[in-house]
Amino acid sequence: MTFDLKTEEGLLSYLTKHLSLDVAPNGVKRLSGGFVNVTWRVGLNAPYHGHTSIILKHAQPHLSSDIDFKIGVERSAYEYQALKIVSANSSLLGSSDIRVSVPEGLHYDVVNNALIMQDVGTMKTLLDYVTAKPPISAEIASLVGSQIGAFIARLHNLGRENKDKDDFKFFSGNIVGRTTADQLYQTIIPNAAKYGIDDPILPIVVKELVEEVMNSEETLIMADLWSGNILLQFDENSTELTRIWLVDWELCKYGPPSLDMGYFLGDCFLVARFQDQLVGTSMRQAYLKSYARNVKEPINYAKATAGIGAHLVMWTDFMKWGNDEEREEFVKKGVEAFHEANEDNRNGEITSILVKEASRT
């Protein structure tokens, strides 16, 4: 039986009649934001798997802002499995000094494209904090970078060590995760063209990036590791960072670790250039140092540089930070990163930064 989970009436019918949940009066609230899902917060009179407040995500087959950008609804199955895998391996991914968590996955309904998970509470994203005036302190930014770096390195270790196990092999089938990355890479050439950049390396790089993301089985990657998917939880005095939540695991798949590197570090470069140089730089340096200390395989600096370049070209225009001239300058920096990666130039601007900062272990 299917329900219209885009409406409150349909949602209530689904929760009460299909799942037999005791929903609190006025307990349903639609959450804003999100590119591809209709998301609800639901308060309950009686606990569901130990929780009296839950989040329900209803997958849509296209971007909220662009119905022509198609994205398969089966992605929710991969998010649910990712949450289960990370939770089951929390002792390997973290330790007493790691504050990174994911919400608990509670239920997945393939018929209604519904994913129910733990409600971790209302909090701001890392993106909110780095764009605030004033932004978070450099000390907090450094802590975030260090924590995320350690967690992602251990995720990459875990993926490499378990790729032959069925519950990990499952992620190789995330075609949505692969094709979404392909669609994003296809924006590189037109994004560069907006700023009058027509470099013969662009189609070569796009082809290489697409081929790799469509075929790589190197390790398990989060694949959407940017500041909008990182929630920061502080203590009641708003002074101590107590927990970092990584959310939106729909694109989790087997693929190149450079994709995770490119997303997070590319975000750090954007923040440093357009928001706060010290915050962005501190976060980047801490991430690289922590990632290098925890990862068991050598970092491929050329691929990481290409991933950062892709992020800069794909997202500089989208974020609309700075003026046209400043954005053009930064898109050019992304294109130059492609040349660095293609030549494996350790003395290039971005590559030299990566090598230097990752070696500070």
Curated annotation (Swiss-Prot):
ATP binds at N37, K57, Q118, D119, V120, D248, W249, E250. GO terms for molecular function: 4-hydroxytryptamine kinase activity; ATP binding. 4-hydroxytryptamine kinase; part of the gene cluster that mediates the biosynthesis of psilocybin, a psychotropic tryptamine-derived natural product. The first step in the pathway is the decarboxylation of L-tryptophan to tryptamine by the decarboxylase psiD. PsiD does not decarboxylate phenylalanine, tyrosine, or 5-hydroxy- L -tryptophan (5-HTP). 4-hydroxy-L-tryptophan is accepted as substrate by psiD as well. The cytochrome P450 monooxygenase psiH then converts tryptamine to 4-hydroxytryptamine. Pathway: Secondary metabolite biosynthesis. It comes from Psilocybe cyanescens. Belongs to the methylthioribose kinase family. Signal peptide: none annotated. One of its GO terms (biological process) is psilocybin biosynthetic process. Its cofactor is Mg(2+). It comes from the Eukaryota. Its EC number is 2.7.1.-, 2.7.1.222. Keywords: ATP-binding, Kinase, Magnesium, Nucleotide-binding, Transferase. This is 4-hydroxytryptamine kinase. The pharmaceutical interesting psilocybin as a treatment option against depression and anxiety is being investigated in advanced clinical trials. InterPro entries: EcKL, Kinase-like_dom_sf. The active site is at D224. It catalyses: 4-hydroxytryptamine + ATP = norbaeocystin + ADP + H(+); psilocin + ATP = psilocybin + ADP + H(+); 4-hydroxy-N,N,N-trimethyltryptamine + ATP = aeruginascin + ADP + H(+). Monomer.
